[in-house]
From Swiss-Prot:
Name listed for the protein in its UniProt record: UPF0303 protein CTC_00911
InterPro entries with a match to the protein in the record: PduO/GlcC-like, PduO/GlcC-like_sf, YBR137W-like
Taxonomic superkingdom: Bacteria
UniProt family annotation: Belongs to the UPF0303 family.
Amino acid sequence: MKDYKKMLKDLEQQEKELVFSEFTNETALNIGLIIIENAKKDNKKITINIEKNKQQIFHYAFDGTSPDNDDWITRKNRVVNRFYNSSLYIGILLKDEKKSIEEMYHISSFEYCPYGGAFPIIMKDVGVVGVITVSGLTEEEDHNMVVSAIREYLNNINSYK
């Protein structure tokens, strides 16, 4: 049996650590390219989407993906934009409470998808300004693909300071 409480604490910690001092369209491009390179290395077929202030500023779909991946992205993004947490966090919270998104929040699972892969773009002293999303793998793999790219990007820029 999974320890949902520990998973929630770990996800909360990720959201505290993975914070940007700025997030520009160039930032989105760089993170998107990191995700592409990591997916190529692992031979993964995914769709990537990055939005800032609800404007799409990066999108890439590997061969072998479909419009279904875009639909998953839209539904995962709605979760982040509503709750200001990663879609995986909300999914784990629901599992811990043993409730569906309909039961707990009275919203449609056709519109809101509480599965991993969408991670909030969190700006220091501002809060959530967007979302980085991957679709095409398991929910944990989608989530980890985004988190590892953000971590790599932040580590790279912090090493130059």
